[in-house]
């Protein structure tokens, strides 16, 4: 997220969305609030035209920046092969949400065993948490710089970005964000 908007632009956007800066990076929440504020600021509904223009320009700039980060990640990521995860159903649509793809099985796939997966003890585990953690480690080895939140959607990047401790509560909020994220953003699941 540090490659998307300048600090001032990010503050302006979060003020227009009426969200605290601690929510910066929670894209599903920001999207929901953007839609609410569009209705509130719309000039035809009695809103402030200048606020609407600024909100639209900042939000569209954020969307374009996030898309370019995702596209850059797709170009950089030669560490995943289709033989690792093969998809031939509707989940091949990269714009579907992770939660829509996994449906009722999401809870079973997000993490297999808390005590084992949270510390990375089982290197063979194929839960979403462990796959994203392995992706994070591989990316770090290849590019010699740690990926950050939005470049990487692993639980570790989420915690470090928002300065959260390891806890069931932070894990719950992370899994809600992953549930509402496009599958293309968490691309190792598809490759």
From Swiss-Prot:
Organism source for this protein?
Answer: KI polyomavirus (isolate Stockholm 350) (KIPyV)
Q: Which GO terms describe its cellular component?
A: host cell cytoplasm; host cell nucleus
Which range is the signal sequence, renumbered to this chain? Answer: none
Zn finger (H1C3-type) ranges are 136-157
Taxonomic path: Viruses, Monodnaviria, Shotokuvirae, Cossaviricota, Papovaviricetes
A molecular-function term among this protein's GO annotations? zinc ion binding
Keywords on record: Acetylation, Activator, Early protein, Host cytoplasm, Host nucleus, Host-virus interaction, Metal-binding, Oncogene, Phosphoprotein, Transcription, Transcription regulation, Zinc, Zinc-finger
- Note the subunit structure: Interacts with host PPP2R1A; the interaction inhibits PP2A activity.
Write down what this protein is called: Small t antigen
Compartments (UniProt record): Host cytoplasm; Host nucleus
In the record's own words, the domains note is:
The common region of ST and LT proteins comprises the J domain. This domain is essential for multiple viral activities, including virion assembly, viral DNA replication, transformation and transcriptional activation. This domain is also required for cyclin A-transactivating activity of ST.
Ranges of residues in domain J: 12-80
Zn finger intervals (C4-type): 117-130
Modified positions (N-acetylmethionine) are 1
């Amino acid at each position: 997220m540090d490659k998307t908007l300048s600090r001032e632009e990010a503050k302006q956007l979060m003020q227009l969305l009426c969200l605290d800066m601690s929510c910066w990076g929670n894209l599903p929440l920001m999207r929901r609030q953007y839609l609410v504020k569009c209705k509130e600021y719309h000039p035809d509904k009695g809103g402030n035209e200048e606020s609407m223009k600024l909100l639209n320009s900042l939000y569209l700039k954020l969307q374009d920046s996030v898309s370019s980060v995702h596209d850059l990640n797709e170009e950089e990521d030669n560490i995943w092969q289709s033989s690792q995860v093969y998809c031939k159903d509707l989940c091949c649509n990269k714009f579907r949400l992770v939660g829509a793809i996994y449906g009722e099985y999401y809870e079973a796939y997000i993490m297999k065993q808390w005590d084992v997966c949270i510390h990375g003890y089982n290197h063979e585990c194929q839960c979403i948490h462990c796959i994203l953690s392995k992706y994070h480690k591989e990316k770090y080895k290849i590019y010699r710089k740690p990926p950050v939140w939005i470049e990487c959607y692993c639980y570790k990047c989420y915690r470090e970005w928002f300065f959260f401790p390891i806890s069931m509560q932070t894990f719950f909020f992370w899994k809600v964000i992953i549930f509402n994220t496009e599958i293309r953003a968490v691309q190792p699941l598809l490759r």
